[in-house]
């Protein structure tokens, strides 16, 4: 049975390792995923998330961090052209099925990386991003997360059932639909999910 995995944080982990001066190989590593395990697990497609933090002490610029992870994604495709193939369309999946390669689809986990700019969203699409969460664990200009902000010290953390999408978030969903970019509702509040379904 072929595996189609919708999420991994390997791009961010490779970026962190690179920033720490201890780069890791995608061929074999101790991260969430590597090429050897993709082959052993009979992977068809792996969604590769560009994960960024919105906290200024963690990231100088969420958009820059996202672009650095996109660069890592493309360098992996260049490094392993006989093993990996980028997936942007349904037709690419059909090609992938007969290619003997493993597919990788570029995604973004934290819509705040766009800095509330529809132009940045369109640019990420042009760079190959085909799925994006509107938020992660932080309220941003698009939406609220599925946890109540400011409850980091509580366990279990209370669910956020009231804060949904902002007006800008609704604009983003409409533009993502126009672009045929998947809206990933992971991490989104219940109210945000209902806003999308309406």
Predicted regions and their residues:
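N-terminal hydrophobic targeting/anchoring segments and the immediately downstream early-domain regions
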Residues: 1-162, 198
């Amino acid at each position: 049975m072929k595996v189609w995995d919708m999420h991994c944080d390997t791009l961010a982990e490779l970026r962190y390792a690179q920033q720490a001066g201890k780069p890791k190989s995608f061929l074999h590593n101790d991260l969430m995923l590597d090429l050897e395990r993709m082959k052993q697990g009979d992977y068809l497609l792996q969604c590769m998330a560009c994960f960024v933090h919105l906290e200024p002490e963690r990231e100088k610029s969420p958009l820059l961090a996202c672009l650095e992870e996109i660069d890592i994604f493309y360098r992996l495709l260049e490094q392993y052209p006989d093993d990996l193939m980028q997936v942007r369309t349904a037709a690419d999946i059909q090609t992938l099925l007969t290619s003997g390669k493993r597919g990788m689809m570029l995604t973004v986990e934290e819509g705040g990386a766009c800095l509330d700019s529809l132009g940045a969203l369109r640019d990420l699409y042009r760079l190959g991003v085909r799925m994006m969460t509107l938020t992660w664990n932080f309220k941003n200009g698009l939406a609220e997360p599925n946890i109540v902000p400011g409850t980091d010290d509580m366990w279990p953390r209370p669910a956020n059932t009231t804060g949904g999408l902002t007006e800008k978030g609704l604009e983003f969903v409409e533009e993502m639909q126009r672009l045929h970019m998947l809206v990933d509702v992971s991490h989104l509040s219940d109210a945000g999910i209902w806003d999308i379904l309406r």
